[in-house]
Amino acid sequence: MKFGKDFSSEWQQAYVDYKYLKTLVKDINRFKRKTNLHGGQISLSSTVLEIEDGITTATIQVSSTASQRYETTFLMTAEKGGEYELVFFRRLDDEFNKVEKFYREKVDEVVKEAAVLNKQMDALIAFRLKMKEESTVEMARFALHGVVSPAELAKNPSMKVHMEAIEEGGSSRAGRRSDEDDYYTDEEDHNDVFFTPANNLSKMKSSSSAFIEVLDSIKINNTKEALQSNTKSVLKVSNHTELKFSRDNLRKIEEKLICAFVEFHRKLWYLKSYSFLNVLALSKILTKYDKITSRDAAKSYMKMVDKSCLGSSDEVMKLMENVEATFIKQFTNGNRTKGMNILRPKPKRERHRLTFSTGFLGGCMFSLIVALVAIVRTRNILQDDGQKQYMNTMFPLYSLFGFIMLHMTMYAANIYFWRQYRVNYSFIFGFKQGTELGYKQVLFVGFSIGALALLCVLANLDMETDPKTKDYQALTELLPLFLLIAMFVVLVVPFNIFYRSSRFFFLTTLFHMLAAPLYKVTLPDFFLADQLCSQAQTLRSIEFYICYYGWGDFKQRKNTCKDSQVFNTFLFIVSAFPFFSRFLQCMRRMLEEKNIEQGYNGFKYIVIVVAVCLGMAYEVDDEKDRQIIWRLLGGITSAMAVVFCTYWDLVYDWGLLNRTSKNPWLRDNLLIPHKEVYVLAMILNVVLRFAWMQTVLDFKFESIHTQTVVAVVASLEIIRRGIWNFFRLENEHLNNVGKYRAFKAVSLPFNYEVDH
């Protein structure tokens, strides 16, 4: 039974330990076979004859205590091998009580959450009613003064009711009452489909002003992502605002409640699956036991399971049905297909054309690299004079795409291995269900960028050597700029193409990182900032793009950027910004979480900022005496940074180097079964960390061009980051498993004052 492949990885410790129970059954079977080999056939055959003749005796006796703990008494301990079976039933009881207790606790949690969502729905419906009433009165008043045309009035039947009441000389109350009754015709079965029979809507039906009483006791919670609300949270100012009845507010409220319903439905689905899989596991293991021992214990034990909360509770199913009915009615206008697609998105199908396209682009990249090497060799393009000029100008432009492609390849490898070892990366990053990219999609994007960049390089070299296009040198120099602009356009295009949800998620996270510490720091925010820390050379290349094309150097293929004081100043800022952004994020987390460890982490990034700035000072300063000082100080601070960062990587980010662990110098829980992988990863991390010091110390190699050394070191840092990514998320996943954290917290739109 492939039991482990179906359960939620965050709850894996709460499931029946089927594997261990199976080993106990094998022990019983091994003893039975050993007994049979030594003359135990007679007793076994007599047992079989008794069963065939209908003479059966009870094997087990099940009971439950006042503390809702189930116990099994094994009645055949006097038989040979009875002690093995006794151990089996004791462990079976422990496993069953564990899952039953966990399930009962989770059911209690979802019932409480259902009550909270119930109150939120009351407030939403009251909000809608209030808006409808205000809109009706407003339209009726405008119609009375001739502002609204008869055609517009005819479109809204409820407005017509109000007009008739007003024209008869009566008050608008009749119209309001009629409109309210029409609304409740649609909402009259709200109590039947939602969570609790005692619903505040019944009070609303008894009085036209009852819903106002609900609205009087609530306020709107500010949107979680809003800059203002996050600033207020740091300043300890209330994040609750008075109700404003506008369509924009209604839209935001509905969006939040939709997210809450989706997450709540997902939790119910997990619980339903949890109950089914555990009952199935218990049934399977007891069937195996009965088959080996020729007893009939499964029937008695499964009766106890069926009577327990795990086997008999129908609260989850009822809640799920009610949630689905309410969601479909309130948010999709009764369209069940649309509603269920939102609540339970269908998994994406693997498309063969994606596999083919990814492989095709990978083959194209390999062919283009071979062609590039052949062209450079045969045409002798990069001669002594041209090589220096090309390496100082065109190489930094094109290496940008190489760094991006390499990083995406490493990320694709991360996704592949996360899936292999069941790391729930989509939950950790907070991706919307069904929108996360797979490793093939990431490879497709990365290979597309790589293939286009190589095509541009070949086109550039070919246009330079071709007499017909040699006069268009300025145009050939613009090819990398055109590609960079095309990438930027694809990244920000608002249309639903090119993985829009992933692009929007990336841009939102990037904005949060740039605006640190004004936004609450989440894992995607600091994870992206860490990626940019390893892409410092890419950021410098972008600055070089602005200088090279903005100041017109591309027309003569000259690099005069480093002669500019402005360029050198921004070089400091660009190089240090990712690390400084991480420092600000650490400070924000330290203030919010009251965690001093975040302060130490922030100090680590400040040391890196100092080391990077000293390295930049050594690079741009022409005075040899000062260069020696900059290099010495840079070497000291970079060595401090490397030691500090290496320790933090291994101990805090990866959770390794635990002396008291059952896996010496690693950690208790390891997803990869081969421990040597962790040792190798630690060694590689240390070596590549020290290789990073080359960016600060800038050692010269006579046989290798400086730009080549820079590109190699930057690539090694990207590879190190890719390795770091896997173990960082593995550790985060194991923390979630230890805390049974399988669902994200969702902010609700309404805040009931009486609750606080």
Curated annotation (Swiss-Prot):
It comes from the Eukaryota. It is found in: Cell membrane. One of its GO terms (cellular component) is trans-Golgi network. Specifically expressed in anther connective tissue. Induction: Not induced by Pi deficiency. One of its GO terms (molecular function) is inositol hexakisphosphate binding. Residues 562-756 form the EXS domain. Residues 1-303 form the SPX domain. Signal peptide: none annotated. Keywords: Cell membrane, Membrane, Phosphate transport, Transmembrane, Transmembrane helix, Transport. Belongs to the SYG1 (TC 2.A.94) family. May transport inorganic phosphate (Pi). The chain crosses the membrane at residues 356-376, 397-417, 441-461, 478-498, 632-652, 677-697. This is Phosphate transporter PHO1 homolog 6. Residues 377-396, 462-477, 653-676 are extracellular. GO terms for biological process: cellular response to phosphate starvation; phosphate ion transport. Residues 1-355, 418-440, 499-631, 698-756 are cytoplasmic. InterPro entries: EXS_C, PHO1_SPX, SPX_dom. It is a multi-pass membrane protein. Pfam families: EXS, SPX.
